[in-house]
C-alpha cells in the first residue's frame, strides 16, 4: 500500500479521528490540514480522488491513478475534507476559504442534480449533524436537511440480498436513533440489524463485501484483514447503538 500521503487517505484518517474522537488541536488534525494546504496536493478547486504515486504500490483497482475517475469521484472527497476543515477549528484562513468555496458550490449542486458519484451522498449525510456550521447560503437548514434525506432514500440499497456485495446499506446513513434519516429508514435499519446478527460467523467476523479482483493477491490479504477489523468495529458500534448486543453480566464470567 502507498506509504505516501494522499487526500483520500487523509479523509479516511480524519473520519476515524472524528469517530474516536481525537483532539482537533492535536498533531493528526494539524498535520492533515498542513498537508491539504500544500499546493502540490491541489486538484482543480479541491483535491484529487486518486494520485499518481498509488500506481507504484499495491492498491485496489479503483484507486489506480485515473484523471477521469478524479473528475467523477473528487466531489464527495472534497466535500468530506471541507467538512473536516470547517468543523474542527482549522486556523488556516486560506484553507478555510477553500473549504467554504467547495461547500457553497456543493450546496448549489445539491438542489440541481442527482448524481454525486460514489461518495457524494455519503458525505452530504456527514453534514446532517453539523448544519449549523455550514457557510451561509440561499437555503435554510431545513431545506438542506430535507434534500439530503431525500437523496439518502434514493441511494440506500433496500434489498437485503444485495447487502452481501458492495452496496450502500442503511447503516451507511443511520448510526443512531437520533439521526435525521432514521424515521424514514427505520424498517430498513431494523432489517440490517437482523442481517448482521444472522450473518456473523461463529468464530470470525463479517467478510468484507468487495475484492481486488485478483490484483495484488498477497497485499489484498493484508488489506482484507485490516478492513475486516474496521468493518467489525463499525458493525458492533451499530448494533450497540440500537441495543442489539447484550452487556456481559458481572459475576457470570466463565473462567474455566
Region annotations inferred by a language model:
Residues 1, 27-47, 92-115, 143-161, ...:
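Long, well-ordered core segments of solenoidal/helical folds
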Residues 1-11, 62-76, 108-121, 157-165, ...:
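Solvent-exposed loop and edge beta-strand segments that line ligand/cofactor-binding
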Residues 1-100:
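Extended ligand-binding groove/face enriched in aromatic
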Residues 1-8, 12, 131-154, 244-246, ...:
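Ser/Thr/Asn(+Pro)-rich, low-complexity disordered segments
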Residues 11-24, 80-91, 123-137, 171-185, ...:
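Well-ordered alpha-helical scaffold segments within catalytic/enzyme domains
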Residues 59-62, 71, 76, 83, ...:
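Phosphate-rich cofactor/ligand-interacting catalytic cores and adjacent structured alpha/beta frameworks
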Residues 147-150, 154, 168-229:
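Accessory, usually C-terminal, subdomains that scaffold auxiliary metal cofactors
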Residues 213-256:
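Long, positively charged, glycine-interspersed low-complexity recognition regions
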Amino acid at each position: 500500500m502507498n506509504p505516501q500521503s494522499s487526500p483520500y487517505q487523509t479523509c479516511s484518517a480524519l473520519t476515524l479521528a472524528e469517530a474516536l474522537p481525537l483532539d482537533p488541536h492535536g498533531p493528526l488534525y494539524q498535520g492533515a490540514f498542513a498537508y491539504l494546504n500544500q499546493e502540490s496536493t491541489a486538484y482543480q478547486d479541491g483535491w484529487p480522488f486518486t494520485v499518481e504515486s498509488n500506481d507504484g504500490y499495491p492498491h485496489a483497482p479503483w484507486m489506480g491513478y485515473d484523471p477521469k475517475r478524479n473528475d467523477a469521484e473528487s466531489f464527495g472527497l472534497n466535500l468530506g475534507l471541507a467538512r473536516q476543515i470547517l468543523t474542527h477549528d482549522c486556523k488556516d484562513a486560506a484553507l478555510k476559504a477553500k473549504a467554504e468555496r467547495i461547500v457553497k458550490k456543493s450546496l448549489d449542486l445539491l438542489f440541481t442534480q442527482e448524481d454525486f458519484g460514489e461518495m457524494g451522498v455519503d458525505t452530504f449525510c456527514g453534514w446532517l449533524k453539523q448544519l449549523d456550521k455550514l457557510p451561509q447560503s440561499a437555503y435554510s437548514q431545513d431545506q438542506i436537511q430535507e434534500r439530503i434525506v431525500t437523496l439518502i432514500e434514493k441511494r440506500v440499497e433496500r434489498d437485503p440480498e444485495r447487502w452481501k456485495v458492495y452496496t450502500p446499506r442503511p447503516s451507511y446513513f443511520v448510526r443512531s436513533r437520533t439521526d435525521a434519516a432514521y424515521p424514514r429508514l427505520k424498517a430498513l435499519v431494523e432489517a440490517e440489524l437482523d442481517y448482521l446478527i444472522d450473518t456473523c460467523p461463529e468464530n470470525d467476523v463479517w467478510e468484507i463485501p468487495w475484492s481486488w479482483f485478483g490484483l495484488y493477491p498477497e497485499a489484498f490479504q493484508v488489506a482484507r484483514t485490516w478492513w475486516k477489523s474496521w468493518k467489525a468495529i463499525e458493525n458492533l458500534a451499530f448494533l450497540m447503538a440500537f441495543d442489539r448486543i447484550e452487556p456481559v453480566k458481572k459475576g457470570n464470567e466463565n473462567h474455566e
